[in-house]
Design a protein with these regions (language model features):
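Acidic, metal/ion-coordinating pockets
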Residues: 1-190
């Protein structure tokens, strides 16, 4: 969502999602079970990201507003969410006193421990709950047409090398891009 093409892409993505919501693949008159998720990197510094400051008073707000408007139900924390540090990310998730409500969805990551990061620790909510706005969790449970679906987020273990995750504890570590079978097992167990 960081490039200027995001303004063109958001309506197209929304149209595709709305078409999928209107599908009746079972031909039973019931809407199909659709969940709208993002794999992360929904906030990427760039021209569009920076232009948000002129319009919304702070960089990145437009990215969150687009995700909210699209109806995203959960986003995995990608490495780019941390590019400007955890204090900046916390402000985008939680909102601000100037009227920006923040993210209408949770950010997910099961392999990051936020308890040691003063900026994000207060946004962490219990796992296995319905999606909560302005929050971070390892998991969430989304109910669609009475059916509960569990979501688990994971963030690249190299985030500390390629971004700025602050005081977050990352699992598995050390992780050099050539994981051992033990490291892969640790990540899979998350």
């Amino acid at each position: 969502a960081a490039a200027t093409e995001a303004l063109d892409d958001a309506p197209r993505l929304s149209a595709v999602y709305q078409a999928l919501l209107n599908e009746d693949l079972g031909a039973d008159g019931q809407p199909d079970n659709s969940i709208f998720l993002s794999a992360g990197d929904a906030i990427i510094p760039g021209l569009f990201f920076n232009a948000s400051e002129t319009i919304n008073g702070e960089r990145g707000i437009a990215d969150i507003l687009i995700q909210n408007e699209l109806g995203i139900q959960a986003i995995a924390l990608g490495n780019h969410e941390f590019d400007l540090g955890t204090e900046f990310l916390a402000g985008l998730i939680a909102g601000n006193d100037a009227g920006f409500a923040g993210a209408n969805f949770p950010y997910l990551s099961a392999n990051l421990d936020f308890s040691t990061d003063t900026n994000l620790a207060s946004l962490v909510v219990p796992d296995h709950q319905s999606p909560q706005a302005n929050s971070i969790a390892a998991t969430t449970v989304i109910t669609v047409n009475g059916e509960k679906v569990g979501m688990v987020g994971a963030t690249t273990p190299t985030v500390d090398v390629i971004s700025s995750p602050g005081d977050i504890t990352i699992s598995p570590l050390p992780f050099d891009g050539a994981p051992t079978s033990e490291q892969l097992d640790t990540l899979a167990a998350v």
